[in-house]
Amino acid sequence: MAETQVRNFNINFGPQHPAAHGVLRLVLELDGEVVERVDPHIGLLHRGTEKLMEAKTYLQAVPYLDRLDYVAPMNQEHAYALAVERLLDIEVPKRGQLIRVLYSEIGRILNHLLNVTTQAMDVGALTPPLWGFEEREKLMVFYERACGARMHAAYFRPGGVHQDLPDQLIEDIGKWIDPFFTTLKNLDDLITPNRIFKQRNVDIGVVKLEDAWAWGFSGVMVRGSGAAWDLRKSQPYECYSEMEFDIPVGKNGDCYDRYLIRMEEMRQSARIMRQCVDLLLGKERVGPVSNTDHKIVPPKRGEMKRSMEALIHHFKLYTEGYHVPAGEVYAAVEAPKGEFGVYLVSDGSNKPYRCKLRAPGFAHLQAMDFLCRGHMLADVSAILGSLDIVFGEVDR
């Protein structure tokens, strides 16, 4: 029988695909069911964030960062706040640092719960998302009680945080931690030993460590390949150097290892939260939560009713904003998805001259072709799930 040359088959994966995480469009070239080439088409959620920030004062630019990785909003604000603080050369008081660390870890748990449980859903398990979202709901309420918003918080401001936390809220966060370990154990027992989940994730999307560095990976993507690289340990910011926690590291660099790391990171985050809660209710119970320089941080309402000086400061801050000394700075935080960096250039005015955002998901998505080659079509959604991509930060 004569051999016939079969043409490769091109299909669109997304943008309306349930496993495509928002607005991702992948053009897949398939040979039968084997993926030969992946071409990610991005930009469907591009809003021009970096350009818009140039027309806003340093304070007005904060809410834009919530809308990048909108699964864990405060972690993005954190990098921006650190960048502005470095240019201004100001310190954040200890209580403010602890509140920031506490809420950064809440963000990490929010992110990992979503990722782990929806990854399980992508490969066919329907119970984990229901359990995970129940816990996320409680954490969203903590967000809301701190700043009034469930998602777009604008709570971390240059100089500290917007307002202090009431003791009752900190106690409630403390009460949430122990039952959460039980929830994690239930999730662990349900997903980790599951035969189907293992078959869908073990040896899928393997990344060697040198490849991970070459592609510009960070966060869970390099830790899954065996590097104990975590900015909270390697370049500590805020008060992470005083916290006790471990960095989980994988061996095989596959989807399953990355899942296990995210599970363990949630436990470590809860550990850090416990330490923060104890300090905030103990030796750091009273104290300022933001810098006391009223040329940068607005004065309290009570002061404005008594002092003309405070009223003038407030008026200047919310009309013109503060001027940041000329210079440039790069500040990075260990966001849940990897290294989130803000490269800020100031020309001495009240608005950023340029603000470049380094989104971890962008670097991870570019390797989609490299990761998927030779895998089956069904593995594409498993690999995509383990990359942990949110389009707000990829398209910006």
From Swiss-Prot:
PROSITE patterns xrefs: COMPLEX1_49K
Pfam families associated with the record: Complex1_49kDa
Membrane topology label: Peripheral membrane protein
Annotated EC: 7.1.1.-
Top-level taxon of origin: Bacteria
Cellular localization per UniProt: Cell inner membrane
InterPro entries tied to this protein: NADH_Q_OxRdtase_suD, NADH_UbQ_OxRdtase_49kDa_CS, NDH1_su_D/H, NiFe-Hase_large
Alphabetical list of SUPFAM superfamilies matching this protein: HydB/Nqo4-like
MF (Gene Ontology): NAD binding; NADH:ubiquinone reductase (non-electrogenic) activity; quinone binding
Catalysed conversion reaction: a quinone + NADH + 5 H(+)(in) = a quinol + NAD(+) + 4 H(+)(out)
Any single GO CC term annotated in Swiss-Prot or TrEMBL for this entry: plasma membrane
Membrane recorded as keyword: yes
Family per record: Belongs to the complex I 49 kDa subunit family.
Quaternary state and interactors: NDH-1 is composed of 14 different subunits. Subunits NuoB, C, D, E, F, and G constitute the peripheral sector of the complex.
HAMAP family: NDH1_NuoD
Function: NDH-1 shuttles electrons from NADH, via FMN and iron-sulfur (Fe-S) centers, to quinones in the respiratory chain. The immediate electron acceptor for the enzyme in this species is believed to be ubiquinone. Couples the redox reaction to proton translocation (for every two electrons transferred, four hydrogen ions are translocated across the cytoplasmic membrane), and thus conserves the redox energy in a proton gradient.
Protein name: NADH-quinone oxidoreductase subunit D
